[in-house]
C-alpha cells in the first residue's frame, strides 16, 4: 500500500484459520498431510498496479478465502542418499470482486485520473498459484555433498481479473548445489562449494 492519486486508506485484515493434519515418521520414511481453510475479512491482496517507485500495490477485498491440502513425503534410500517431496494444492478465491481500472485518453494514453468499476464476481486471488511442488534429492558421502532441487509453480495471475494475457505461465526450474568439506591442521573444517541456478536454462 502507498498513497496515490486516489486517496484510499487500507483496513486491517482479519483471518480465521482452521487446520488439521497428520504426520508419520520412521527410520526410512516420513510422510504428512495437512488440510487448511483460511477465511479472510478485508484481506490485503495485490491488484496488479505499481506505485510511483515501481512497488506492487495492494487493496482490501471484503470477502475471500484460501483452502487446500499440503502433502509431504521423504525416503532415505541409502545411508548417503535421500529424496524428499512436497506439494500444495490450493484454491484461492475472492467473492463478488469489484475491481477498478484506470481510464486513459485513447489517442495519447494520458492518464485521465478517473476509474471504471469492473464487476468480476468470484475470481482467483492475484499471485496465488493453485499448485506448488518441490523435490529435493540429497547426496552425502565422505565430505562430499550434492543437492538437486526442483520446483513447479502453476499459473499466477498478475491482478484479480483472471485474464490469461495478464498472467505468469507455469514454470519448472531446477538447481544444483555441490560442496566438499575437509579438515586442515588447526582448522576444524573448511567447506567449498558452488550452486548452479536454473541448471536447464528454463525461461
Describe the residue ranges of each PLM region:
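C-terminal beta-signal and adjacent terminal beta-strands/loops
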Residues: 41, 93, 151-159, 180-203
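Membrane-embedded beta-barrel scaffold of Gram-negative outer-membrane proteins
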Residues: 9-60, 65-67
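Extracellular loop and loop/strand-boundary signature of outer-membrane beta-barrel proteins
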Residues: 3-9, 17, 54-60, 68, ...
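Gram-negative outer-membrane beta-barrel transporters
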Residues: 37-40, 59-160
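Residue-level preference for beta-strand/loop junctions
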Residues: 14, 27, 65, 129, ...
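Repeated loop/turn-to-beta-strand initiation elements of outer-membrane beta-barrel proteins
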Residues: 28-31, 80-83, 143-147, 184-190
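Hydrophobic, lipid-facing positions within transmembrane beta-strands of outer-membrane proteins
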Residues: 6, 16-20, 67-71, 131-135, ...
Amino acid at each position: 500500500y502507498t498513497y496515490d492519486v486516489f486517496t484510499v486508506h487500507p483496513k486491517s485484515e482479519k483471518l480465521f484459520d482452521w487446520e488439521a493434519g497428520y504426520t508419520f515418521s520412521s527410520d526410512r520414511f516420513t510422510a504428512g498431510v495437512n488440510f487448511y481453510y483460511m477465511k479472510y475479512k478485508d484481506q490485503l491482496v495485490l491488484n496488479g498496479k505499481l506505485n510511483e517507485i515501481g512497488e506492487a500495490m495492494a487493496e482490501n477485498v471484503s470477502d475471500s478465502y484460501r483452502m487446500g491440502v499440503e502433502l509431504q513425503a521423504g525416503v532415505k534410500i541409502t545411508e548417503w542418499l535421500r529424496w524428499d517431496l512436497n506439494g500444495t494444492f490450493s484454491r484461492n478465491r475472492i467473492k463478488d470482486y469489484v475491481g477498478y481500472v484506470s481510464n486513459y485518453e485513447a489517442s495519447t494514453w494520458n492518464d485521465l485520473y478517473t476509474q471504471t468499476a469492473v464487476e468480476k464476481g468470484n475470481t482467483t486471488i492475484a499471485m496465488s498459484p493453485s499448485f506448488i511442488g518441490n523435490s529435493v534429492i540429497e547426496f552425502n558421502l565422505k565430505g562430499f555433498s550434492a543437492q538437486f532441487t526442483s520446483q513447479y509453480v502453476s499459473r499466477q495471475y498478475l491482478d484479480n481479473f483472471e485474464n490469461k494475457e495478464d498472467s505468469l505461465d507455469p514454470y519448472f526450474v531446477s538447481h544444483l548445489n555441490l560442496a566438499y568439506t575437509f579438515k586442515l591442521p588447526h582448522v576444524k573444517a573448511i567447506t567449498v562449494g558452488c550452486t548452479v541456478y536454473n541448471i536447464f536454462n528454463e525461461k
